[in-house]
């Protein structure tokens, strides 16, 4: 059931910012941007649409996709840490930054160690952690294609502004640890599980749509100028907020329900088809 939308009139392009989730949305199941989708995105960027790669990944884990789309040349942004940071790919400038409260780094790490859960964070090169051989640290390294560096004492090592601490551990223990953390750090941090073995600990109120709102405001635009594509629960606020919220064919039912349009799945150029339809097709 494809929603029928009125075509915009005149030559003023309505969607000036295009926010894309990565895994399950921009990339197929082999984590590749398929040719039709890549061509559509590059054409959109060349028309002046600002492409925002939006993910819970660290900045360093998104950079290869930004390079592949040539956003450093064509213009675009990386929204990392689920909205904790937005950088301009052309200038390298930080446009939005939500810093993890420095005074909570030690308490979170101490709590994690007590429950046999490993904390990690990121620097410009990759992961920083107290146990680089931990299999779940290895999983985060593999997902982002980044190395892990081992340090003796993580809180002592962190001398730069971080955007999140990721806690990794046995999926059997994680629901309990998540619950305890939410009690202990209530009103101080945003805490949720992003995978059975991952607990994200973030500054309060950080999520994709809130950071996109700041970016749009900086550009003198509003949600009506935003098109967003996603597939997972963490994309829900962004899909609801955008003037054109697009759900992938492989999206969870809640995202499909919230979206204005449902496109093909990530194995069949869902993003490319939606960009062709709403951005590249000339207004009639």
Summary of predicted features, one role per range:
Residues 111, 115-229, 233-235, 241:
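Conserved acidic, metal-coordinating active-site core of Asp-based
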Residues 69, 74, 82, 185-187, ...:
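Short, structured coil segments at secondary-structure junctions
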Residues 1-20, 39-42:
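Non-catalytic pre-domain segments flanking phosphatase-related domains
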């Amino acid at each position: 059931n494809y929603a029928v939308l009125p075509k915009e009139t005149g030559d003023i392009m309505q969607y000036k910012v295009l926010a894309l989730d990565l895994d399950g949305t921009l990339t197929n199941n082999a984590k590749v941007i398929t040719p039709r989708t890549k061509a559509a995105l590059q054409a959109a960027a060349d028309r002046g649409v600002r492409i925002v790669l939006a993910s819970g990944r660290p900045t360093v884990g998104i950079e290869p996709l930004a390079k592949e789309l040539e956003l450093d040349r064509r213009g675009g942004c990386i929204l990392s840490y689920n909205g904790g940071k937005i950088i301009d790919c052309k200038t390298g400038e930080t446009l939005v930054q939500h810093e993890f409260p420095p005074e909570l780094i030690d308490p979170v790490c101490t709590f994690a160690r007590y429950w046999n859960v490993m904390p990690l964070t990121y620097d410009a090169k990759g992961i920083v952690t107290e146990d680089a051989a931990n299999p779940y640290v290895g999983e985060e390294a593999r997902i982002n294609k980044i190395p892990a560096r081992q340090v003796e004492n993580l809180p002592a090592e962190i001398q730069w502004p971080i955007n999140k601490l990721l806690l990794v551990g046995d999926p059997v223990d994680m629901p309990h640890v998540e619950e305890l953390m939410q009690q202990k750090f209530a009103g101080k941090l945003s805490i949720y599980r992003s995978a059975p073995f991952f607990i994200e600990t973030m500054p309060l109120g950080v999520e994709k749509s809130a950071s996109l709102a700041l970016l749009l405001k900086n550009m003198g635009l509003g949600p009506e100028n935003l098109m967003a594509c996603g597939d997972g629960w963490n994309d829900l606020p962004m899909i609801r907020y955008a003037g054109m919220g697009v759900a992938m064919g492989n999206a969870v039912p809640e995202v499909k329900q919230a979206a204005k349009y449902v496109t093909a799945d990530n194995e069949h150029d869902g993003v490319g088809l939606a960009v062709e339809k709403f951005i590249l097709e000339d207004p009639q």
